[in-house]
Amino acid sequence: MGCCYSGETDTGKGDQGEREHLLPQNQSLPNNKQNGSEQNPTNNPSARTDEQAMLSRILAKTAQNIIDVSAVESQGMEQHECMDRARQYSTRLAKLSSNLMDWKNVPPLPSLTSQPHQILASDPVPFTDIQQVSKIAAYAFSALSQIRVDAKEDLVVQFGIP
């Protein structure tokens, strides 16, 4: 049914298979044209057997790294173990749900309108209006950032109290 790829590699081999060349170093790639004519791979039986050998080696390495999940024996639980776990889960769930009761007492968000579907279905705000509001907000920010207070005299005045 299901299979998983095992990414584990044998530590004795290291990363040898990963860095191993598929073609031997002394063997170069064959030229497509030899003496002006194309080379047909079916005409060269040694190249075909080498290719088959490489494909077989890749297939064997892949088969070693696959774990058949359907063949793995499942752990059987006895009835009392199952009941214990169910009891544990229900107590944990009760603890967590008691914290959720605090959220039920929170009042809902204020309703700005009694018919939100009409607002959501209405035409969008024109882009020129959005630009105008942005421009006004920028002017207001600029004006507020330029406000300076100059202290010309003491703010606290001492009265003649004996």
From Swiss-Prot:
- Where do we find S-palmitoyl cysteine lipid attachment? 3-4
Residues linked to a lipid group, N-myristoyl glycine type: 2
* Cell compartment(s), UniProt: Lysosome membrane; Late endosome membrane
Q: What is its main location?
A: membrane
Where are the residues of the annotated region Disordered? 1-50
Please give the function described in this protein's UniProt entry: Key component of the Ragulator complex, a multiprotein complex involved in amino acid sensing and activation of mTORC1, a signaling complex promoting cell growth in response to growth factors, energy levels, and amino acids. Activated by amino acids through a mechanism involving the lysosomal V-ATPase, the Ragulator plays a dual role for the small GTPases Rag (RagA/RRAGA, RagB/RRAGB, RagC/RRAGC and/or RagD/RRAGD): it (1) acts as a guanine nucleotide exchange factor (GEF), activating the small GTPases Rag and (2) mediates recruitment of Rag GTPases to the lysosome membrane.
> Coiled-coil intervals in this record?
none
| Protein name per its UniProtKB record | Ragulator complex protein LAMTOR1
Q: How does it sit in the membrane?
A: Lipid-anchor
